[in-house]
Every structure is written in C-alpha cells, then in structure tokens.
Amino acid sequence: GSARDAARAVGCELEQIVKSLVFICDGAAVLALLPGNRRADAAKVAAATGAFGARVARPEEVVAATGFEPGAVPPFPAPHVVGTFIDEALLTHEVVWCGAGSERHIMGLSPLEVARVTQAVAADLAEEA
C-alpha cells in the first residue's frame, strides 16, 4: 500500500498523493500531510508546530491518535491529534489523492478542501529534495 502504488492506481503523479504521517511533538500527536514523493523533515515539523522536538509516532501511537493503522491513515478524521499541518507543495495542485481509511480506498479532493476540513496550517515540512 505505498504512495507509488496509489499513484499508479488512479493515474496521477506521485506528488499528488497525500501521505498522512503522525508525529509526536512534545508528547502530543500531530498529523503532517506531505506529497507522496517527499520525506518529512522532523525538525521542520517541530518548527511548524512550535514544539521543541518531533519524532515519528510508533505504530501503537498512530492507532491511538487516529484509529487507523500506519499506512492507512486518512487526513481526516483524526480524533486525537492536536493539529494538522499540510506541506505547501500540496497546495499547488488542483486535485490531490488521499487515503480514505484503508489501503484499498482513495479519494480525490482539492487540496484547499483538505486544508479546510482538517483546519490544517500550511508549512514547509519536507526534507530538501
């Protein structure tokens, strides 16, 4: 269930796939939404959230924060995250493709709609290419 598989399935570019990643920032779970072709930079995630540090959540923390297994996390709903952050690069597309709660389901949305529904803050979250 990789971003690459998802891009192939819907016939879009990898950068239009939304990866939903849970980070633990100063003990609280946050959701970072990144393009499928980029890796999250933990230092940038921490900076965006105003936290001292950020680390990738462990699998059990992902489930606790979102109710979903790692790899199947949709951008919403995320009942126990304190905030959602969207990488600015995603906002440049007309349509992005998000996981919809399982590795087999995917939905296309405007990135502005994703940001609105999740009340996401736009930030630079990705490692330099």
Task: Describe the role of every protein-language-model region.
Residues 1-129:
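Extended, low-hydrophobicity, polar/charged segments
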